[in-house]
Amino acid sequence: SLDTTGNVDLTSANVKAGSLDLNAGNKLILDTATQTTHQVSRDGATSDKTTLGPAANLNVAGDASIKTGGDFQQNAGNLNVGGNLNANIGGNWNLGVQQTGEHKVVQRANGVSDTDLNSATGSTVNVGGKSAIGVGGDLTAQGARLDFGQGGTVAAKGNVTFGAASTTSTINANSSGDQGNRSYAETRHGADQALTGTTVKGGDTLNVVSGKDINVIGSTIDLKKGDANLLAAGDVNVGAATETHVYNSRETHSRSGVVSGTKIASSQDATSTVANGSLISADGVSIGSGKDINVQGSTVVGTHDVALNAAHDVNITTSQDTSQSSTTYQEQHSGLMSGGGLSFSVGNSKLAQQNQSSSVTNNASTVGSVDGNLTVNAGNTLHVKGSDLVAGKDVTGTATNIVVDSATDTTHQAQQQQTSKSGLTVGLSGSVGDAINNAISETQAARESAKDSNGRASALHSIAAAGDVAFGGLGAKALLDGAKGPQAPSIGVQVSVGSSHSSMQSSEDQTIQRGSSINAGGNAKLIATGNGTPKDGNITIAGSNVNAANVALVANNQVNLVNTTDTDKTQSSNSSSGSSVGVSIGTNGIGVSASMQRAHGDGNSDAAIQNNTHINASQTATIVSGGDTNVIGANVNANKVVADVGGNLNVASVQDTTVSAAHQSSAGGGFTISQTGGGASFSAQNGHADGNYAGVKEQAGIQAGSGGFDVTVKGNTDLKGAYIGSTADASKNSLTTGTLTTSDIENHSHYSANSAGFSAGASVGVSTKAVGPSSVSGSGGVTPMVFQNDSGDQSATTKSAVSAGTINITKPGEQTQDVANLNRDTTNLNGTVSKTPDVQKMLSQQADTMNAAQAAGQTVSQAIGLYADYKRDAALDAADKAYKAGDLAGAQAALNEAKGWMEGGASRAELQMGGGALIGGLGGGSALTAIGGAAGAGTSSLLANQAEKISKSVGDTTGSSLVGNIAANVAATVGGALVGGSAGAAMASNVQLYNAGNDSNNQTSNDVFASLSKKVAQAIAMTADGKAGVWNGMVNVAGVIVNLPNGGPFASPGDPGYVSLDGLKKPYKSGTSIGPDAEFWTPVLATLGLGGKAAAGTGATTTSADAATVGNGALKTASGDLSAAGNAARTQPYGNGASASPSPGTATAGSSGANAQLPTANGGVAAAGTSSATNVGKVVIDGKIGGQLEARGWTQQEVQAVVNEGPVGTTMDNRSAGKTPDGLPRNDSASVYGSKSGYVVVNDRTGEVVQVSGKNDPVWIPDSRIKWK
């Protein structure tokens, strides 16, 4: 027994008693003292350590009675009573903690570490028997452990608080260092709060009574058996204690070298809060409040019945965890750095990134009974927010108004990034350098496209990269081989000065609704009684679920079953710009260049996602409302549904919606000027995308099972895309309503993404580019990109219906719709549409695909052109070799092949069509664009010669071949668009620019082809029809001669040169072999003079040139000579079977044959075997001159062409008799045709070609006797 008028101070005391009767006139102090020590180590580290002293213990083996006139102060003290405890505290009973820990500061060479680590030791109360505790003031326990062995009562006139003790530990550190060319600095700050809740235990019923409020915050009341009864005159708060965690860091790192330096700075700031809820658990739980009961993020659960009764409100809601974080990163490089690809830069580059995020996450409360009933009564409002009510049996909620709804989780994320670069860059230039640089960039682009799941763009980038590698390799080889000329590749080094900047911002804000639930094994009943005012007495269940065997919703006014809405809002924007000027030096000399580009874009999206409310009853669902019942975005499902609505019944579905839009545009251009030429280019792209979706995800309605529905509505029943359905027989379905209206909801989904672009360029002289329209020397054009178009439209209907059954309209005079037309089929009512895709990603992929298709399009067209050129040149070479070898059939076959591979040829066009289909298909992503690409490429290839004519015509008109070439490209592009749309236009432009426009050997090949074609045609005709015609003509003439009486002055049958008529008159055809019995010796038609006899020849005549001229008087008939026949035959071509009539002055032509002519009559008699002159029209070319033509670069057509253009000079033909074909001297005037670089001299009298010079031979010395005009 201890009785005192003052304080009883048992600090760090250890008191033991068999029983205790303690009466303190003032305070009772049961504290455990703390002690603090300070230490300094040898290395300068300091430590301040706080520890507990001897524990304060008041140990009573039996019963204890404690009475105080003042407060009972217990900090880390221990009260242990083996029997019953009877306590009467006159003041407050504070069960607190003592904080211990260590504050340590360590000084190091590179920084300081400052740590403060703390923990709390709470008080304990352990009672073996029953407890009867009265507190005149407040009972406050923080981090305490209370064990009331056999239960009892704890009552306080003030507040009863079971709370959590809090301690905070901090870490602060900084360090820095400088190691020559490297330095760093780091700071760290961390603060972590730790909570220790109060734990109340008992072996039997425990009553906690308060004259004010009861607060269970972050703490636990856990009884092994018995009930936990909490009764307060004020509020009962069962909630969460919140701990806070903070982390901050700053870092800087720098490195400097001889040629470069790097600085990196980063920071991180993060704050989070975590809510630690409370728990009340017992066999049964009863909570009564004179005001409000608030359960926040906590659990109240009983094995048996649980009851919450409040005079005012009952709020069962959530607690929140929160987080906020912000990070920054800055990186700066200076000096020498990579410039991308094979280039390097000297300058500065900066990267700055910022990220912010925040979130609020709700923690649900749970109130319920495992095996019993849950009853919640509120004098005013029962509000269940984002939480759960559960009972093994029944759940009953009664209040003036009842709200069961959702709590809102939120997230926010934002990112910003800025980059900038300026300085001097050194890299490769020229066409070879450009190809190498582009190969590297296209390879990188292919990887990025693959990461972005854009397979088409990745494939196209890979094609372009492979082409750039090949063209770069070919160009490099050509340089090593010493290639010269306007199409020769170039390489050099470029030094440029420039700057670039880019920025990007994006953000996303989301809200997610966490609905509530009510789950009962038996019945779930919610009753809103109202308080007599018109607007009270409502039940609202939003985005939540009620599940029970039977559900009853009874409201004095309205029953509102409605949806909640999640939202997702995104915003983004980007911009970039750059410019540079440079100087290059390389195989094309010195050059200058400049470029500029700019881009910007934005995107926004707003989405709303609906969460339906669900009322599910395995047996009966009953809804009774004095006013309206609204089932909006909600579903009532039960075996039987009964509804009695005093107002209107509104059932409506709600739509998820998404609205999105994105835009992206870019433009850039540049020029280069070198000593050998220059070029300029420009490109632009623009893309726009939008999407709009509205669709019912879950249709609203009332669905009954085999029990049917019985719905009575005093006012109007309105169905908007909703239903009242049943699987029962129609006899069990009844709808009685004042009036009935129905309507459908139209769902739709639309998206459209379109991207377009073009590149334009031109070059004069020698181009130093390998890619783009300005890469073709002396040409240019506009190349459209393959238009990108992705779109989709869907529509569907969410219909209204009422299952078959009885429909009674009680206000027929107000009924506006014909009930007979009502849809009674409640199956498949909700027509759905697909949601729209991410239009911003779609737009990004479209831009990537367009760029890839353009790069690959040039590669494919150029590669096919090179292959076709090779095939063409090889075929022409084969034709030439076959012609010279006398294989005319082989020559013609090779020429036919060459024609197919020439510009405008079918073989070339077929390959270009294949390439166009490949690029068009990959670029446009459809069979239609593949067909369009093929059509455009094929058309452009087949019409290459027409495009060349356009180029020449426009070029001649404007005086600029470049303008002509651009006009040809535009024409090809337009033609491609007409036959193949955008893909056709792009492929047509590629073929014209990178194939035909890039074919420097086209004209030369055309000339070679024309020359060879004529030679082969002439030779074929000569050796075929011409051979037969000449022989048969000779046979007929010989027949005249042989049939002369007595042989005349000619050969007689005994002469060696005699040939019988029978042998001569065999029919000769193309390819006929002349045998020994029909040899036609040359001397047969020749004479040695008047009356002479021909000597036997030694070879058979094989060409018309070997036939001797029939001169005046050379051949005589019985009545005169045959000179008239020769005169008549001077210019008349004779074909197969041509004959000269024995009558003077006449000649008859036979069937037509090639190159078969009878000799001329002028000029006397030619010697046997001598080739006579062949008249080709205006001019005559003898054998000697004919042999010189090809060697000096002429064809007969070209000789005739320059003669037709008129003379350019005069001279004289003074050839001696030994140099003329007829053996007669010349002393005639002559005209000169052509030019000094290639001319022809023609005798004005005879038309003979006297002389030809080397054609286009710069070293040829013209005849000094020529008088030039």
Swiss-Prot record:
Q: Where is this region: CT domain, has tRNA nuclease activity?
A: 981-1269
Residue segments, region FHA-2: 1-251
Which residues lie within the region annotated Disordered? Answer: 317-340, 491-518, 1124-1155, 1207-1231
Q: Motif ELYN CT motif, which positions?
A: 992-995
What are its E.C. numbers?
Answer: 3.1.-.-
Feature: compositional bias, Polar residues: 508-518
Q: In which residue ranges is the amino acid composition biased (Low complexity)?
A: 317-336, 491-507, 1135-1155
The family database entries (InterPro entries) matched by this protein are listed as: Colicin_D/E5_nuclease, Colicin_E5_C, Colicin_E5_C_sf, Hemagglutinin_rpt
Annotated transmembrane regions: none
Annotated localization = Target cell, Target cell cytoplasm
Disulphide bridges in this chain?
none
Its main localization is cytoplasm
Provide the function of this protein.
Toxic component of a toxin-immunity protein module, which functions as a cellular contact-dependent growth inhibition (CDI) system. CDI modules allow bacteria to communicate with and inhibit the growth of closely related neighboring bacteria in a contact-dependent fashion. The C-terminal 282 residues (CT domain) acts as a tRNA endonuclease on some (tRNA1(Tyr), tRNA(Asn), tRNA(His)), but not all E.coli tRNAs, and inhibits growth in E.coli. The CdiA protein is thought to be exported from the cell through the central lumen of CdiB, the other half of its two-partner system (TPS). The TPS domain probably remains associated with CdiB while the FHA-1 domain forms an extended filament with the receptor-binding domain (RBD) at its extremity; in the secretion arrested state the C-terminus of the RBD domain form a hairpin-like structure as the FHA-2, PT and CT domains are periplasmic. Upon binding to a target cell outer membrane receptor a signal is transmitted to activate secretion.
The Swiss-Prot or TrEMBL note on domains reads: The C-terminal domain has toxic activity, which can be exchanged between N-terminal sections from different toxin molecules.
The text of the family note is:
Belongs to the CdiA toxin family.
> What is this protein called in UniProt?
tRNA nuclease CdiA
Q: Which organism is it from?
A: Burkholderia pseudomallei (Pseudomonas pseudomallei)
Gene assigned in the entry:
cdiA
